[in-house]
């Protein structure tokens, strides 16, 4: 059984918490046994999460994994302080894993509607409501989602269940949006984890009793037992009371752990030395990785070169084996000839012995001796001549073998180049894209004689010429299509230029009308100012008349009223004319703006459509490639 990696850590660390929150909301402190739909916290029971265990979120946040580790409080997280979501919601791999996990859960639990991973990439609001109702039905079978205000009901349900992160109302309207769906799918995964924990509690309630001694280990190596849980509870109680040091609790749990695991004090020093050595090894490897960031790439290139060398040497060994077989056959025939020659030599020796015996037992005359010497000289000359001819033949045979080896190597090089080009053009093997069921591969067998490659002329040339003709036809069609698209592009460019000139003219007219509007507005303001000045003069005149002459008061008052009525009429007329002119200008500007926007939108759509067609055509434009392929086909066909 593994021990926690940080049990023997520093016991004098200071708390990293900046605030001890006294939360009045007791929702986060409820245990799973409180009620059927109790708070399930953030426990992730799924075993299909990623290999990085740091992404898992435990029931009460991350546990302290030792006496000296940091203990961050997650209690009171439903207060006013906003909790940062530790899950990698911007990681596409994590979101895809959550979608896959949700799809598997729905399929395994008999979801009535058809659902796939593709359909869960961006679901609609109706699909989300159905999925939420289906999952929440396991926790509360009698629950029915109201027809209206679901955008308030669903976040409220999550909040009641203890979901630590807020869900906005606006996110309920845009469930499938790229910026909203990761938060929603993570919340659904949390809800499925709640159901899994709830199901586990119902099936085996004894596993959650306080008196249960757990003997297993988690993924991070913490042993589940009563000793560890008591230590965590005491530390947290001490922390909530204001304590920041835990020397006594650490010493107590260390002594209990030593008794529990039978720790040998002498082995601790050895383990510390081993730990130091491993840390030094890790630092050395990190330095090597920093000094050689591309070492893996260079090693891969070196491995590729070694693999290429191995293939070359294997081919060379195969050639050597075939050459060795040929030499063995030749050596066998030479040995047979040597044996035959030895037998002939033995027979000649016996004949010479017999003749020598006859020669020793008979007497020769001078003429016989001269004749024999003459015949011997002639035979010696014949032997010398045959020896020279044999040496010449052997030299010629050696030259022919060298010439044969060079020709064979040249043929194999050409065949390798041919096979490489054929693979690049997808002509071999038979199942290749461009082979069309024909076998374009050439097998060179020099033992079959000088005509071993003749059969490939009829086997390859006809289908190859057929492919060449088809390629030429495709090139011709592509050229025609390119010309037609270029004509279309020129026409569209001409239309665009014409529309741009029209837009420019309309903009100039709009500017002129705008200037006219401002001019009219300025004239109206000047007229209004003039009337105001006249009114001021009349007021002054009125005051003079009132102070100087009492007799003509009624007459002056009537005159003043007449002038005021005239001023009101003038003001109403001026205001009405200004309003009409402004309305006319506004309507005209709106019409011009709408027309300009529609024309610009149409031009933008046409430009984007033309750009897409042009990019598609340019991406399919293989004229140069097909021309090169055609030339290579012709060269290979002529060489064959």
Swiss-Prot record:
Signal peptide annotation: none
Coarse class of the protein's main subcellular location: nucleus
Family in the record: Belongs to the NDC80/HEC1 family.
Composition bias type Polar residues, residue spans: 22-33
Protein name from the UniProt record: Kinetochore protein NDC80 homolog
InterPro entries xrefs: DUF5595, Kinetochore_Ndc80, Ndc80_CH, Ndc80_sf
Subunit structure: Component of the NDC80 complex, which is composed of at least NDC80/HEC1 and CDCA1. Interacts with CENPH.
Gene Ontology molecular function terms on file: cyclin binding; identical protein binding; kinetochore adaptor activity; microtubule binding
Pfam family, one: DUF5595
GO annotation, biological process: attachment of mitotic spindle microtubules to kinetochore; cell division; centrosome duplication; chromosome segregation; establishment of mitotic spindle orientation; G2/MI transition of meiotic cell cycle; kinetochore organization; metaphase chromosome alignment
Organism domain of life: Eukaryota
Residue ranges, compositional bias (Low complexity): 1-16
Chain positions covered by the region annotation Disordered: 1-47
Coiled-coil zones: 265-427, 464-573
Organism, as annotated: Gallus gallus
């Amino acid at each position: 059984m593994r021990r926690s990696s940080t049990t023997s850590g520093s016991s004098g660390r200071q708390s990293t918490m900046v605030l001890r929150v006294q939360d009045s909301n007791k929702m986060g402190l409820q245990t799973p046994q409180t009620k059927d739909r109790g708070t399930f916290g953030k426990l992730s029971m799924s075993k299909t999460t990623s290999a990085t265990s740091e992404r898992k979120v435990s029931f009460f946040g991350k546990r302290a994994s030792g006496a000296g580790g940091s203990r961050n409080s997650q209690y009171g997280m439903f207060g006013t302080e906003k909790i940062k979501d530790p899950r990698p919601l911007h990681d596409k791999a994590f979101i895809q894993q959550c979608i896959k996990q949700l799809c598997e859960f729905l399929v395994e639990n008999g979801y009535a509607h058809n659902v796939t991973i593709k359909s869960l990439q961006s679901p609609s609001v109706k699909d989300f409501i159905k999925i939420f109702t289906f999952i929440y039905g396991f926790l509360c079978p009698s629950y029915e989602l109201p027809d209206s205000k679901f955008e308030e009901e669903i976040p409220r349900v999550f909040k009641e269940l203890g979901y630590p992160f807020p869900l906005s109302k606006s996110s309920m309207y845009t469930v499938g949006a790229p910026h909203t769906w990761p938060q929603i799918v993570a919340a659904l995964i949390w809800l499925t984890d709640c159901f899994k924990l709830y199901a586990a509690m119902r099936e085996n309630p004894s596993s959650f009793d306080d008196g249960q001694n757990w003997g297993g280990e988690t993924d991070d190596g913490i042993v589940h037992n009563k000793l560890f849980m008591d230590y965590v509870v005491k530390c947290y109680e001490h922390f909530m009371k204001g304590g920041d040091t835990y020397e006594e609790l650490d010493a107590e749990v260390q002594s209990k752990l030593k008794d529990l695991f039978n720790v040998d004090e002498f082995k601790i020093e050895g383990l510390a030395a081993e730990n130091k050595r491993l840390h030094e090894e890790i630092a050395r490897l990190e330095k090597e990785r920093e000094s050689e960031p591309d070492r893996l790439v260079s090693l891969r290139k070196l491995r590729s070169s070694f693999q290429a060398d191995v293939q070359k040497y294997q081919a060379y060994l195969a050639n050597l084996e075939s050459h060795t077989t040929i030499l063995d056959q030749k050596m066998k025939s030479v040995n047979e000839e040597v044996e035959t020659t030895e037998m002939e030599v033995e027979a000649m020796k016996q004949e010479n012995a017999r003749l020598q015996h006859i020669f020793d037992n008979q007497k020769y005359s001078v003429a016989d001796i001269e004749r024999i010497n003459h015949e011997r000289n002639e035979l010696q000359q014949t032997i010398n001549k045959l020896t020279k001819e044999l040496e010449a033949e052997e030299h010629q045979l050696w030259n022919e073998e060298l010439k044969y080896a060079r020709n064979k190597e040249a043929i194999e090089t050409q065949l390798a180049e041919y096979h490489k080009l054929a693979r690049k053009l997808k002509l071999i093997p038979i199942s290749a894209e461009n082979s069309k069921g024909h076998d374009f591969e050439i097998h060179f067998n020099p033992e079959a004689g000088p005509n071993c490659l003749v059969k490939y002329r009829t086997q390859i040339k006809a289908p190859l010429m057929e492919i060449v003709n088809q390629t030429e036809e495709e090139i011709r069609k592509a050229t025609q299509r390119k010309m037609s698209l270029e004509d279309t592009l020129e026409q569209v460019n001409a239309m665009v230029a014409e529309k741009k000139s029209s837009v420019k003219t309309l903009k100039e007219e709009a500017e002129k009308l705008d200037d006219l509007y401002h001019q009219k507005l300025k004239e109206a303001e000047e007229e209004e100012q003039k009337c105001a000045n006249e009114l001021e003069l009349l007021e002054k005149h009125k005051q003079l008349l009132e102070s100087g002459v009492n007799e003509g008061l009624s007459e002056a008052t009537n005159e003043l009223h007449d002038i005021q009525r005239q001023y009101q009429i003038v003001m109403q007329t001026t205001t009405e004319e200004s309003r009409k002119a402004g309305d006319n200008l506004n309507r005209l500007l709106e019409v011009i703006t709408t027309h300009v926007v529609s024309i610009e939108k149409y031009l933008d759509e046409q430009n984007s459509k033309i750009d897409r067609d042009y990019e598609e055509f340019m991406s399919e434009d293989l004229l140069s490639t097909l021309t090169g392929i055609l030339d290579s086909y012709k060269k290979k066909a002529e060489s064959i």
